[in-house]
Curated annotation (Swiss-Prot):
Belongs to the DNA mismatch repair MutS family. Residues 1-17 have a biased composition (Polar residues). Keywords: ATP-binding, DNA damage, DNA repair, DNA-binding, Nucleotide-binding. It comes from Azoarcus sp. (strain BH72). GO terms for biological process: mismatch repair. It comes from the Bacteria. InterPro entries: DNA_mismatch_repair_MutS (IPR005748), DNA_mismatch_repair_MutS-lik_N (IPR007695), DNA_mismatch_repair_MutS/MSH (IPR017261), DNA_mismatch_repair_MutS_C (IPR000432), DNA_mismatch_repair_MutS_clamp (IPR007861), DNA_mismatch_repair_MutS_core (IPR007696), DNA_mismatch_repair_MutS_N (IPR016151), DNA_mismatch_repair_MutS_sf (IPR036187). Disulfide bonds: none annotated. The gene is mutS. Transmembrane segments: none annotated. ATP binds at residues 632-639. GO terms for molecular function: ATP binding; ATP-dependent DNA damage sensor activity; damaged DNA binding; mismatched DNA binding. Residues 1-22 are annotated as: Disordered. This is DNA mismatch repair protein MutS.
Length: 872
């Protein structure tokens, strides 16, 4: 199917200026015909050294790229709006447009000037969309660019996604309410959905959304397309037959990707059905709150990824990002990864990890280079980088052999054993320092092809021939300053000054007359010129043919290269885990079949790097201790403590060591967080509504094997409403969900739950008052806190002193007031006089410091005047 059909699903499009194409100039007719096939994309139309855009495309590009909008004459009686970018800088403009979610069609000149009447022939050479990028210049080397197709049927969300840069093809079916969580996990660059699907949330989540015809999302079409592609009778071997909604999405995705690449997708060698149950459940709020790869402000650091990513290759960085967003529920693979990390750490000297990281240094992006080879758009320097990377593999395998051949390390070493003939082929074929593009020549190595060597020899010997000819002609003509030279405009020529023009032999034919010299050509020089120029053109054509043949020869190695790339990425990620363990003192966690979490000396991996003295804390949860009711002052460290427990569990389930003295972890199926909130203006939801929505998801989804983090639930509404909700939610978690819960609150009434539910333990993060200052200890202690120190924190924040004094007075009054039956009291009602309330007035403080028996009459008088001034 053509991309034009994919894009024209709603209605027939008119030409950009709303007139019949035939009324335009021939060149504009050619442009409009191409544009008609791609109405929803920007068209870059090659004209000489520029890519031009016209009409509405020009206006849009000028606005998005901040380039000049001008006019270029008229067509059909109307001015042609035009904007353009130089061809040599096109990649940077494409990158900017793709980041903005735009797609671009590039039409190149394919004809020869003057070969036909009318404009030079042009044809579409590339279609660039956010989800189908393969060029290194357009891709973020540390983040995957995924193309995702989604469909909905009877409450089932079917998804298919493709990483075109490396050929990974995945499917999943899940409940429709999982949409946001899945999008937060996958972060697709471009999304395809049926034209008839009404899904407002998708409009918000998708960075680049494209609607396709409903009939393209058909499971039967998927069977036909995919069995043809994989060369199988059915799809049973891939285990995807049970997911018809996802298969329909896969059909639309495959057709779209193939149309954009304009060729077969040879590197799509498999199809895998993922299931939600494979991974720890992390909803969108949890991924944000734990700041795995982005801070709450949307910045790349400081995050867990920015801390751990010391990878030597871009493949390793992408593997690490993926691993953090895909903690595995089955602990077999995480345990195997931890065994490999332990092998790299060794006895604590880190020599194995250092050796592996040293061998990986300088390894290119084999993953994406392999994809470009399969798509036949690999550039010469891709192949030279692949050659250099493959040459490092023997050293890397030798290092792994010294570590051991058991477990995951042995499997990775085996995957690195790529056939030696592949490296030999690249060493023979590609020049040591090839040109950037095949069209520039100098790509194929000398000695690889006899015909190419002969043609290059003609060019190489050109200088010797010209020097010999110049010497002979000087002797024959007697003109001592005669020169034989070359330029691109006039080719080869013999140059003679006007003063010697009468001495030239009869066989000289004038080629050009200049102010001071005459330029000639002879039959011998003309014959050599034809041969030399022909050799250059033939050499370039031969080199292009050899390069295409080389890509063909590399195709059978694509599966092996894909396996090698996966092994390199995994090894790099595991080495980064080992580096973190060595650098920060992480330990190997222990997985247990008994429910619970037992952490000694736990730390927050990111926060501990931001502060000078981080206080370690223990955490113990189990069947008889399912909830920790955490109280304590603001800034005391409650949120940090809860997050560190969650991050330690997550790191264990991705296969890393953890920041603790020890950690024993029982089975987990999910991590839920309700930490902080802000208004969701786009959806019209208040802070409290966001808070309740997240709490609802937890109460409906958490199980006895889930870790739940609840931070100050109920604070977004009135005091009694919030307290009532917090109490009811805590009881539900204890009675119904029976989750392992960390429940932080300032409602001290909740600490009474311990009397009704022994499995709810009270703990607090303490603080002490030192003079007029408050010191946060950040240490977790048993029992409830004595107070929240909220007013003291307000003073630290710079709230004016009169406000602080007024707040203290009102707090004392509220604490002394009996809360009776009836409606909720008004916090802002006038306070009754309270003569017994001790006020911290400066006069009272000064009086308390006076010892009357020790004062002389003069000192007493001075103190009296001082008190008078204080009371003024």
């Amino acid at each position: 199917m053509s991309i034009s059909k994919i894009e024209s699903v709603n209605a027939e499009k008119q030409s950009p200026v709303g007139t019949e194409i035939g009324t335009h100039t021939p060149m504009m007719q050619q442009y409009l015909r191409i544009k008609e096939q791609h109405p929803d994309t920007l068209l870059f139309y090659r004209m000489g050294d520029f890519y031009e855009l016209f009409f509405e495309d020009a206006e849009k590009a000028a606005r998005l790229l901040d380039i000049t909008l001008t006019t270029r004459g008229q067509s059909a009686g109307m001015p042609i709006r035009m904007a353009g970018v130089p061809f040599h800088a096109v990649e940077q403009y494409l990158a900017r447009l793709v980041k903005l979610g735009e797609s671009v069609v590039i039409a190149e000149q394919v004809g020869e000037p003057g070969a036909t009447k009318g404009p030079m022939e042009r044809a579409v050479s590339r279609i660039v969309t956010p989800g189908t990028l393969t060029d290194a210049a357009l891709l973020d080397d540390r983040r995957d660019a995924l193309l995702l197709a989604a469909n909905m049927h009877r409450g089932v969300l079917g998804m298919a996604w493709l990483n075109l840069a490396n050929g990974e093809f995945r499917l999943m079916e899940c409940p429709a309410e999982s949409l946001q969580a899945q999008f937060e996990r996958l972060r697709p660059a471009e999304v395809l959905i049926p034209d008839g699907l009404a899904l407002p949330l998708m409009e918000t989540l998708a960075p680049a959304l494209r609607r396709l015809a409903d009939w393209q999302f058909d499971a039967d079409t998927a069977h036909r397309l995919l069995t043809t592609h994989f060369g199988t009778r059915d799809l049973a071997g891939f285990g995807v037959e049970e997911a018809p909604v996802a298969l329909g999405a896969a059909a639309a995705l495959y057709d779209y990707a193939k149309a954009t690449q304009r060729q077969s997708l040879a590197h799509l060698t498999g199809l895998r059905l993922e299931r939600e149950a494979e991974f720890l459940r992390l909803d969108a709020a949890t991924r944000r709150n734990l700041e795995l790869t982005e801070t709450l402000r949307g910045e790349p650091s400081p995050t867990l990824l920015s801390l751990l990513d010391t990878c030597m290759t871009s493949m390793g960085s992408r593997w690490l990002r993926h691993a953090l967003h895909h903690p595995l529920r089955d602990r077999t693979i995480p345990a195997a990864r931890q065994q490999a990390v332990a092998a790299l750490v060794g006895d604590g000297d880190g020599l194995h990890a250092q050796a592996v990281r040293g061998a990986l240094r300088g390894v290119a992006d084999v993953d994406r280079i392999t994809g470009r080879i399969a798509l036949r758009n690999a550039r010469p320097r891709d192949l030279s980088a692949l050659r250099e990377s493959l040459s490092r593999l023997p050293e890397l395998r030798q290092t792994l052999a010294q570590i051991g051949d058991e477990g995951m390390v042995g499997g990775l070493a085996a995957a690195l054993d790529v056939q030696p003939e592949l490296l030999q082929c690249l060493q023979r074929a590609i020049a040591d320092e090839p040109a950037a593009m095949v069209r520039d020549g100098g790509v194929i190595a000398a000695g690889y092809d006899a015909e190419l060597d002969e043609l290059r020899g003609i060019q190489t010997n050109c200088g010797e021939f010209l020097m010999a000819l110049e010497a002979r002609e000087r002797e024959r003509s007697g003109i001592a300053n005669l020169k034989v030279e070359f330029n691109k405009v006039h080719g080869f020529y013999i140059e003679v000054s006007h003063a010697n023009a009468d001495k030239v032999p009869d066989d000289y034919r004038r080629r050009q007359t200049l102010k001071n010299v005459e330029r000639y050509i002879t039959p011998e020089l003309k014959a050599f010129e034809d041969k030399a120029l022909s050799a250059q053109e033939r050499a370039l054509a031969r080199e292009k043919a050899l390069y295409e043949a080389l890509l063909d020869a590399l195709s059978p190695y694509i599966p092996a290269l894909q396996g090698c790339a996966r092994a390199l990425a995994t090894l790099d990620g595991l080495a980064a885990f080992a580096e973190a363990a060595l650098r920060y003192g992480y330990v190997r966690p222990v997985f247990s079949d008994q429910p619970g979490i037992e952490i000694r000396g736990g730390r927050h991996p990111v926060v501990e790097r931001q502060v000078e003295d981080f206080i370690q804390n223990d955490a113990r949860l189990g069947s008889t201790r399912r909830m920790l009711m955490i109280t304590g002052p603001n800034m005391g460290g409650k949120s940090t403590f809860m997050r560190q427990v969650a991050l330690i569990c997550l790191l264990a389930h991705v296969g890393s060591f953890v920041p603790a003295q020890s950690a024993v972890l029982g089975p987990l199926d999910a991590i839920f967080t309700r930490i902080g909130a802000s208004d969701d203006l786009a959806s019209g939801r208040s802070t409290f509504m966001v808070e309740m929505t997240e709490a609802s998801a937890i109460l409906h989804g958490a199980t006895e094997h889930s870790l739940v983090l609840m931070d100050e639930i109920g604070r977004g509404t009135s005091t009694f409403d919030g307290l009532a909700l917090a109490f009811a939610i805590a009881r539900h978690l204890l009675e119904k969900n029976r989750s392992l819960t960390l429940f932080a609150t300032h409602y001290f009434e909740l600490t009474r739950l311990n009397g009704e539910y022994p499995e709810c333990a009270n703990v607090h993060l303490d603080a002490v008052e030192h003079g007029h200052r408050i010191v946060f200890l950040h240490a977790l202690e048993d029992g409830p806190a004595s107070q929240s120190y909220g007013i003291e924190v307000a003073a630290l924040a710079g709230i004016p002193a009169p406000v602080i004094r007024d707040a203290k007075r009102r707090l004392r009054a509220l604490e002394n007031r009996e809360v009776g039956a009836g409606p909720q009291a008004d916090l802002f009602a006038a306070l009754p006089d309270d003569d017994d309330a001790p006020l911290s007035h400066p006069v009272l403080i000064a009086l308390a410091e006076i010892d009357p028996d020790s004062l002389s009459p003069r000192e007493a008088l001075e103190r009296l005047y001082a008190l008078k001034r204080l009371s003024a």
